[in-house]
Regions:
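Conserved ATP-binding loop and adjacent catalytic segment of the adenylate-forming AMP-binding
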Residues: 83-85, 162, 169-231, 239-242, ...
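Adenylate-forming
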Residues: 240, 274-303, 329-340, 356-362, ...
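Conserved ATP-binding/catalytic segment of the ANL
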Residues: 220, 227-287, 304
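Conserved pre-ATP/AMP-binding loop-to-beta segment of ANL
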Residues: 1-17, 24, 49-55
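Conserved AMP-binding/adenylation subdomain of ANL enzymes
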Residues: 36-55, 63-149, 158, 183
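Conserved AMP-binding A3 loop
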Residues: 13-39
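Conserved C-terminal "lid"/linker of ANL adenylate-forming enzymes
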Residues: 285, 310, 318-321, 349-389
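C-terminal boundary motif of the adenylate-forming
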Residues: 266, 304-328, 353
Length: 389
């Protein structure tokens, strides 16, 4: 008798490893149903807008589920043209590739989007004349349309939308995109969900939100008052993994008896089902009277300030200290001395503390000469710097 293969949605499709942001990587066992669940959502929500025979520029690592699903598997299914970079991606290389390939949709991490906007866009539109024109009600709309067209050219002219995932988008960049009507989208997920949990396309984008639950997934916040008090974001559905490879203890720690996967992320949820991730529960710090401090929110503000390339906020002896890697290219271009840089950072610290609650004030800024070590999805490996003071 001939034995034919019987399709089983629970069959193991792949083992993908977590990015290791908070520690060692774990092997995530993803069944075919999880891959299908993600593809079914993308086909429903993205395919009608981009169709077939599109150009896709791959800027994300294929070893990470975000890139593997959105850039590779989804577009293989659609039969699109995928262009791979032949060198390690840098903002300059990506900018060149965008202008040449003109992708129909772009998937990226916030770091890349941030660099393109700050290097290629802001220097042209943050002149006194441009600011004056954008603030004049009579011509404001026309100017913003021109700015939108200019920004689109920097992202390849014709993307249906630019999808940001892997980490939150910087608030300054996000507000700029919204103000000029740029087609920004946001996805949120984990390796354990292959990867999508929530998504916001440009037509239902809400500032600060990572979107609403995707098709096939239930998502909720474990809080008595989820609109105002952050709780852990949990999800359940066909996108969820089978478990961690040869690690039942770790599996049981994140998937409860009712099938809910515990992400470890703290979030709130508004009345319309939009989720707002505040930070990782493992990263959350406690203020002097037990207040919750989310270092990611402080870092987001600090990263928009003068001469700051990236930062990490850590706690040392009950005080908050910001480790800052300066934008050395800008520092050198302007001819700043070490003393100049120290003075700028102190001014940054004072401005930062005016924008945040008193219990979350940063006591000092310490300069970090090298870029912080990152995962494949460009998230800083925070655990390496907890004892850096």
């Amino acid at each position: 008798h001939v034995k034919y293969h019987v399709d089983d949605p629970e069959e193991l499709a792949m083992i993908n490893y977590t990015s290791g942001t908070t520690g060692f990587s774990k092997g995530v066992m993803l069944p075919y149903r999880a891959l299908w669940g993600n593809l079914d959502y993308l086909i429903d929500s993205v395919k009608p807008h981009i169709g077939k025979n599109c150009n896709i520029l791959s800027t994300l690592p294929m070893a990470h589920m975000y890139g593997l699903m959105t850039e590779f598997l989804f577009n293989i299914v659609l039969g699109n043209h995928i262009f791979f970079l032949t060198r390690l991606p840098s903002p300059t290389l990506i900018s060149e590739a965008l202008s040449e390939i003109k992708p129909d949709i772009l998937y990226a991490v916030p770091l890349v989007v941030d660099k393109i906007v700050r290097k290629e866009v802001f220097p042209h539109i943050q002149t006194n004349r441009a600011r004056l024109l954008m603030n004049m009600p009579v011509i404001n709309k026309r100017i913003k349309e021109k700015v939108r067209e200019f920004v689109l050219r920097k992202f390849g002219e014709r993307p249906y939308e630019v999808v940001v995932g892997g980490a939150p988008l910087n608030k300054e960049i996000e507000n700029f995109f919204i103000s000029v009507g740029f087609p920004i989208a946001m996805g949120y997920g984990t390796t354990e969900t292959a990867p999508l949990i929530t998504f916001a396309h440009q037509d239902n984008y809400v500032a600060g939100s990572c979107g609403v639950a995707v098709k096939h997934m239930e998502v909720k916040v474990l809080s008595d008052d989820p609109e105002n008090v952050a709780g852990e974001l949990v999800c359940r559905g066909i996108n969820v993994m089978k478990g961690y490879y040869k690690n039942q203890e770790a599996t049981d720690a994140v998937i409860d008896k009712d099938g809910w996967f515990h992400t470890g992320d703290l979030a709130t949820m508004d009345a319309d089902g939009h989720f707002f991730v505040r930070g990782r529960s493992k990263n959350m710090l406690l203020g002097p009277n037990g207040q919750n401090i989310y270092p990611e929110e402080i870092e987001d503000k600090l990263n928009s300030m003068a001469m700051v390339n990236e930062s990490i906020v850590i706690q040392s002896d009950d005080k908050l200290v910001a480790l800052v890697h300066p934008d050395m290219e800008e520092v050198n271009n302007l001819g700043f001395t070490d003393e100049d840089l120290e003075n700028i950072m102190e001014q940054n610290r004072k401005e930062l503390n005016m924008q945040i609650p008193s219990f979350a004030k940063v006591s000092r800024i310490k300069l970090h000469n090298q870029e912080f070590e990152k995962t494949a999805k460009k998230s800083i490996k925070r655990y390496l710097y907890q004892n850096a003071i």
